[in-house]
Design a protein with these regions (language model features):
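Alpha-solenoid repeat scaffolds
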Residues: 26, 30, 52, 69-73, ...
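TPR/TPR-like alpha-solenoid helical repeat scaffolds
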Residues: 61-62, 100-109, 147-152, 172-198
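Structural marker of alpha-solenoid helical repeat scaffolds
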Residues: 48, 92, 134-136, 168
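Structural signature of tandem alpha-helical TPR/SEL1-like repeats
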Residues: 28-41, 68-88, 112-131, 154-161
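Amphipathic alpha-helical repeat scaffolds of TPR domains
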Residues: 2-26, 49-69, 95-113, 139-147
């Protein structure tokens, strides 16, 4: 951050602190308006600070993974702390993709830990985070959304999200999808079976096409043309092999 930008942000912060003090002395709608303006001021001060955003994201990422190793209240505290760090990161940089996705993951893990129902607020918050991720980069969190819709038994939304993930090439491997407990409710339904069968056929066709493409680009065999005379054998050049790999003059 340049000195000018730093000075500008400092001035903005001081003005916002004064606005907060004024809000505390006010009442009713006047106070609410001043508080709202102050919050916007704080957000503007924090906005576009890449280093701070990266630090918050990685802090949240560490908390998320530590939470996965804990149980009970300690895990809840760590998940909530991770969620707060990701939210703060996105306050600084609203387009921080990793914070959006992992914020949703943290909400889902917390929902599982607390064994809440699929329509609980925690799952809804996860859904909001995944939708933010998709708005930043289309399809990146479509599979995560499919998992939420799968838990809720929402066929149409789940299928649409799976198709979007497929089209954006963000689906996990088929075996991971089939083993995902979030999709247990829908796995036996005809539409899901048809989707997986079509996916497997597409993968097989893509694999066959890739193999054919590799084979067509493989280097042709080469052979050495050797000219023989009574006294010596001299290698003249290295040439591309003819269509029929049976050169009459090839040295034996």
């Amino acid at each position: 951050m340049s000195l000018i930008a730093s000075f500008t942000k400092k001035s903005k912060l001081n003005a916002t602190i004064k606005q907060t003090a004024q809000a505390r002395k006010s009442e009713g709608s006047t106070a609410d308006g001043l508080f709202k303006a102050a919050y916007q001021g704080y957000a503007e001060v924090l906005h576009d600070d890449p280093l701070r955003a990266d630090a918050l994201y990685n802090w949240g990422f560490a908390l998320l993974h530590q939470a996965k190793t804990k149980t009970g209240d300690e895990a809840v505290r760590l998940y909530q702390d991770a969620i707060d760090k990701f939210a703060f990161c996105m306050l600084i940089n609203p387009n921080y993709l990793g914070a959006a996705i992992n914020g949703g993951v943290a909400y889902m893990d917390l929902a599982r830990l607390e064994k809440v129902k699929p329509d609980d607020k925690l799952y809804e918050m996860a859904k909001i985070q995944f939708e933010k991720a998709n708005a930043i980069q289309a399809g990146t969190a479509s599979y995560n959304l499919a998992c939420i819709y799968g838990l809720r038994g929402d066929k149409d939304a789940c299928l649409k999200a799976l198709e979007n993930a497929r089209d954006k090439v963000t689906l996990p491997e088929a075996v991971e999808i089939l083993n995902d407990p979030d999709l247990d409710i829908v796995k036996g339904q005809d539409w899901f079976v048809e989707f997986m069968e079509a996916l497997n056929k597409k993968n097989e066709a893509d694999e066959a096409e890739n193999k054919a493409d590799v084979a067509s680009k493989a280097p042709e065999k080469k052979w050495k043309l050797v000219e023989k005379n009574a006294d010596s054998e001299e290698t003249i050049t290295e040439q591309e092999a003819p269509a029929e790999d049976n050169p009459a003059e090839e040295a034996k």
